[in-house]
Regions:
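Glycine-rich phosphate-binding loop used to anchor ATP phosphates in small-molecule kinases
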Residues: 79, 83-145
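P-loop (Walker A) phosphate-binding loop of NTP-binding proteins
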Residues: 39
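Conserved substrate/cofactor phosphate-moiety recognition/catalytic segment
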Residues: 53-90
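Conserved lysine of the Walker
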Residues: 44
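Hydrophobic anchor at the beta1->P-loop junction of P-loop NTPases
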Residues: 36
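A glycine- and Lys/Arg-enriched "phosphate-lid" helix/loop adjacent to the NTP-binding pocket
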Residues: 118-189
Length: 240
């Protein structure tokens, strides 16, 4: 009798432990590699970090330091190509290290898409510089893995500039010219209107709290989990 009680208690402890494991396991994603994209100020990095924490994924965050940016903003001759190539080589090095390390065995959320480099190149470079850039880009892009899903975060230019002004005040960061952000936002819209390399979720972020609301995060995860092939548009409804 005592043996039967001990066995029953042992079984109870095992099932209770398993229940605890399943209870606290973070929800998984079907997509192993997700890239978030959008213009400056849209909230890519903050969302990547929150999503990764929520689903126990690793993050790949873009390295934004560039010694040529000051000269580029000052419109010094040759600085645009120098800044663009520096970003391109940095992004390729980061993507190549990921591929070699096989980090995609765990879900990975990246706050940029490698192809976005061309958005800036076509906006910033003249024809001669663009010819040089394009030859190098085509060579490097062969080594870069495509994401399983791209999430394009949209926002009106006025909202982007408002967020960038707040960021500048908080961190003493450089804020690009509002007219440049307008052109960049339009370039992003054009790029993703024609994008077809991977499944694409387009998210209108004007009414989204990407930094604080768990409900917002849960709603977005539902959209991500429901993605199939092609492009889907998600325009959240305002609450209340």
């Amino acid at each position: 009798m005592n043996q039967a009680i001990r066995e029953a208690y042992r079984t109870f402890v095992i099932f209770r432990s398993l229940a605890a494991v399943f209870r606290y396991t973070r929800p998984a994603l079907d997509f192993r590699y997700i890239a978030l994209e959008g213009p400056p100020g849209v909230g890519k990095t903050a969302l990547a970090e929150r999503l990764a924490a929520h689903v126990d994924a690793t993050t790949v965050l873009e390295e934004t330091d560039n010694p040529f940016l000051g000269d580029f903003y000052a419109e010094r001759p040759g600085a645009a190509l120098q800044a663009q190539l520096f970003f391109l080589l940095n992004r390729h090095r980061q993507q190549e290290s990921l591929r070699q390390a096989d980090l995609f065995s765990q879900a990975t959320i990246c706050d940029y898409l490698f192809e976005k480099d061309r958005i800036y190149a076509y906006l910033n470079l003249d024809d001669n510089d663009l010819f040089i850039y394009q030859r190098l880009y085509e060579l490097l892009a062969r080594d870069v893995a495509l994401p399983d899903l791209v999430v394009y975060l949209q926002a009106p230019t006025e909202l982007l500039n408002k967020r960038l002004r707040a960021r500048e005040a908080e961190a003493d960061a450089y804020r690009p010219n509002p007219a440049y952000i307008q052109k960049l936002n339009e370039a992003y819209q054009h790029f993703f209107f024609h994008y077809a390399a991977t499944p694409l979720l387009v998210v209108e972020t004007s009414q989204l709290d990407l930094t604080g609301s768990d409900d917002t995060l849960d709603d977005l995860l539902k959209q991500i989990r429901g993605m199939g092939r092609g492009t889907r548009y998600y325009v959240p409804r305002t609450r209340g």
